[in-house]
Amino acid sequence: MIRLDKICIWTLIVCFAGMIWSGSLVKPIDEMACYTLLAMGLMDCIVNHRWRAYRPLLLVIAIMAGYVVYSTFKGFNTLPYIVMDAIIELKPFVPFMVILVIKPQLNLTERRVLKGIAIVNIITVLVLYAMPVFRDYTLQLHLMFLGTTCFISMLVYLYCSIDEQGHVSPADMTAVLVMLVVGLGCARAKYYGEAVLAIFFLLLYRPGMSRGVKPGYWLLSLMVLVAVGMVSWNKFSYYFLTGNGDTIDPTVAETFARPVLYATSGLILLDHFPLGSGLASFASYASSAHYSSLYYEYGINNIYGLSESYPDFICDAFYPSLAQFGVVGVVLFITFLVWAFRPATRLLRLDPQRHRYHYVIAALAMCFILIESVASTMPMQTWGLLAMAIMGLVAAQAPATRAVQPSSVQLNHLITYRT
C-alpha cells in the first residue's frame, strides 16, 4: 500500500534539507520536488478518481496550454522554449494545489525531523557567514540565499512547534526569533523588510485587533509600513532610481537591466493587450536561453545584462515576466494569490486562538513571496516552492467552503491505493 500523503511529506523534507544548497550544488532539487508532487496529484486523480478536487490545478494547466498556443502564433521564440517556459511557470502552483488536496498531516517524528533540519540550516548559515571566500568563490552561493534559508527555516520551525491548542512554547518562540535574527547577517534590504513584518506578526499581532478601527491599530500599522519602507529604501533607490549614483538621474535607467525590465514590461502590457507577448518572450529564463526577438523590437538588446551575448540579468525579477501574460495574466495571478490566502482567513475566523499562528505563517509566506519577487525569481526556486508548500499545509487545515462527497471525506487524511 502506497501512502501519497507520506510521499508528499518526505518530498518536502528532502527539499527542505537541500534548500540551502539548491543555489549552487544541487540545483535540480526544486524540479525534483515539483515533479514528484505533480506525479502524486496525477496518481491521486487516476487511482482515487479525484479529478474534481484538482480542478484549480487542471485549470492552471489548461490556461498555460492556451498560452503555449497563443505564444506560438506570436512568434517571439521557438516552440521548445515556449513549452520549457510553460513548465517553469507552472512550478509555483503545483506545491500549493497538490498539498491542498492531498492534505498531508505531520506526525510527531516528522515534525521533529523538520525542526532538526531547520536548526542544522541555521548552523550552516552561521558557518557560511564565517567563510566568505569558500562561500563566494567555491560554492558561488549568494548571501541572499542565506537570508531566505533563515526565513523559510523559521516558518517551518514555527509550523512544527504549534500544539493542538494552537500554542507555541516560549522556548520554541525564542528559537524562531533567533533564526530570524541570524538571517539579518545576509545584509539584504528585502530581508530587513520581511523581518520587520515577521516581528509584527509574531510579537504584536492579535486576532481581531483591527475591529472597531481603533486609532492605536492604525498607528501601529503605519509604523510597521514606515519601518519596512525605511529598511528597503536604499535598495529600492539603487535598483530603480539612482543606480550607482547618489542622486536621481532619469538617464541611468538606460544602463541598468532591472529598471529597463520593469519599464519595458509596462510597455508590453500596453502594446500586447490583453494577453501579453507570450511565453519565452520576456524576462524569463527561456527568453534568455534562446534569445527572444522581442528584445530587439524594444531596442533593449544592447543593455548590459540583457544582450544576446550576455543575457545574465534577463531572468532577474519575477514581476516583469508577468508581461508575457498580459493584463489578463496579471489579473489571474492576483486572483490566485487572493484565493490561496482565503483558507488562512477562514481558519482565523473559525478559531482565532487555535489558528492564530497558522494565519501568521500563511501571511508571512505570502509576504515573503511578494517581497522577494521584486528583485528575484524566488517563486520559481526552492525557497519559493517551500513557501507555497507551507501555505498549502495551512490551507489544507481550513474547512471546505461547501460540503464534499463522502468518498472525498474518506480520502482526506489518508490517500492510499493498493499495488
Where in the sequence are the language-model features?
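Transmembrane signal-anchor hairpin modules in multi-pass inner-membrane enzymes, especially those
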Residues: 1-69, 104, 108, 160-170, ...
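Helix-loop-helix junctions and helix-breaking kinks within/between transmembrane helices
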Residues: 19-33, 136-145, 170-208, 229-235, ...
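Aromatic-anchored transmembrane helix interface
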Residues: 31-38, 56-70, 77-101, 116-118, ...
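Alpha-helical transmembrane segments of multi-pass inner-membrane proteins
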Residues: 95-135, 141-206
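A membrane-periplasm/extracellular boundary helix in multi-pass inner-membrane enzymes
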Residues: 181-186, 203-249, 267
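Interfacial juxtamembrane loops and adjacent helix segments
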Residues: 281-318
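Hydrophobic transmembrane alpha-helices and their immediate junctions
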Residues: 324-367
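Transmembrane alpha-helices of multi-pass inner-membrane enzymes
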Residues: 359-419
